[in-house]
């Protein structure tokens, strides 16, 4: 808990064996779990964190949209508060507002959905709400549509999908309200008055996952270069008949291609270590 170094180490080691598993791990614990832990309040921690950690509650991180990519501030998904029923209505107003390339989309039972929080007709910017995707029989809940992204050229162990919401209602308590919530009178409140500052504070709480992506890439590159180096020290290449076969590592042309790449993981390792310490 709260140990970025340990989490990065897990990411790097997992990436040396199975990148699909690494991404699934990151989605479950880093993105979905991180959203609940870092954007939610104590009531969310008590209700969900242990189940997420045990893998009993599988979840998604539904931020990216088809029409907006990583332009989070322009997301079209709406989270509209219904005062009379004390519920939040989650809605995708069009195809482009669908959540795109979401990991765990085919297995997840809940999603942290990001969208524009609207109270009394006024948008208070991007917030996140927990939405149940599937019931106890793993059937999609009413108003939830999920579409598989299909075969990919890699990482096919990840169930990437698209998700749309058609006026799906969730309790007000499902709003992750650490940086902004709605009180019992239906009035919006936030410890950060400035919307832009609040937006960047929310996103900043999740930046640790970006560091872990680098750790995973580093782990994969170490394995690839280890294989390439060992192979170069065993594989022999024939030449003129009178000469003995030579190791391909003895060829200057092979050294020129391989050795600079062998140096880079050392550089990235120390750079990531420095970034972890700064974080």
What label would you give each PLM region?
Residues 83-145, 162:
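A short core secondary-structure module
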Residues 101-104, 164-209, 229-250:
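A glycine-rich, basic-preceded beta-loop-alpha segment at the flavin cofactor/substrate interface
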Residues 54-63:
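A short, Trp-centered hydrophobic/proline-enriched beta-strand micro-motif
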Residues 141-167:
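Flexible, small-/acidic-enriched active-site or ligand-binding loops
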Residues 204-279:
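Extended amphipathic alpha-helical segments enriched in small hydrophobics
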Residues 1-55, 107-110, 269-272:
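Internal helix-loop-helix
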Residues 35, 65-70, 96-98:
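Sensory/regulatory domains in signal-transduction proteins
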